Structures are given as C-alpha cells and as structure tokens.
Amino acid sequence: MKEQKLIHEGVIIESLPNGMFRVRLDNEDLILGYVSGRIRRSFIRILPGDRVKIEVSRYDSTKGRIIYRLRNKDSND
C-alpha cells in the first residue's frame, strides 16, 4: 500500500545548497523542501519568494518534496 502524502502550499524563504529550500507553509510551519525529479528535469527555476506546492510525509513533517511552482500574479511568465 502506498503511503499517503499531505500536500501543502507555502513560500520559499531561503535557498540552500543542493536543490534544498527553506519553505514557510501557509500554517506558519517552517520545513526543509527538496526539488522533485520532474522539476529538476524540466529546468524549472525556483527562487526565494516563489509560492510552491509541497508534498509532506505523515511520518516526517520536517521535510517535503516540492512538486509544483505556482505562478506569481505579477510576473509575465
């Protein structure tokens, strides 16, 4: 049986080495996020201030996988 993941939205606070990011979730929790392979393969650039969807395990709620970068309303891309 596959493990159920919780999906949250948050804002990138800080960029760390090796594709890791500090993310503040909408419920004010700070967690460590890493970039999923699909985002890495697609060369999607994630910068501090970007809103992202992050998948968090039930067993370790301090780490999560960034699965989607949400579009900013004020950007042109």
Curated annotation (Swiss-Prot):
An example molecular function term from Gene Ontology annotations: ribosome binding
**CDD domains found in the cross-reference section:** S1_IF1 (cd04451)
Keyword Nuclease attached: no
**Pfam families, A to Z:** eIF-1a
Residue ranges of domain S1-like in the record: 1-71
Q: InterPro entries annotated for this entry?
A: NA-bd_OB-fold (IPR012340), RNA-binding_domain_S1_IF1 (IPR006196), S1_domain (IPR003029), TIF_IF1 (IPR004368)
Which key words tag this protein in UniProt? Chloroplast, Initiation factor, Plastid, Protein biosynthesis, RNA-binding, rRNA-binding
Q: Which GO terms describe its cellular component?
A: chloroplast; cytosol
Where in the cell does this protein reside? Plastid, Chloroplast
**Summary of the function given for this chain in its UniProt record:** One of the essential components for the initiation of protein synthesis. Stabilizes the binding of IF-2 and IF-3 on the 30S subunit to which N-formylmethionyl-tRNA(fMet) subsequently binds. Helps modulate mRNA selection, yielding the 30S pre-initiation complex (PIC). Upon addition of the 50S ribosomal subunit IF-1, IF-2 and IF-3 are released leaving the mature 70S translation initiation complex.
Q: How does it assemble?
A: Component of the 30S ribosomal translation pre-initiation complex which assembles on the 30S ribosome in the order IF-2 and IF-3, IF-1 and N-formylmethionyl-tRNA(fMet); mRNA recruitment can occur at any time during PIC assembly.
Q: Which HAMAP family does the record associate with it?
A: IF_1 (MF_00075)
Give the record's family classification: Belongs to the IF-1 family.
This one is known as: Translation initiation factor IF-1, chloroplastic
* Provenance organism: Dioscorea elephantipes
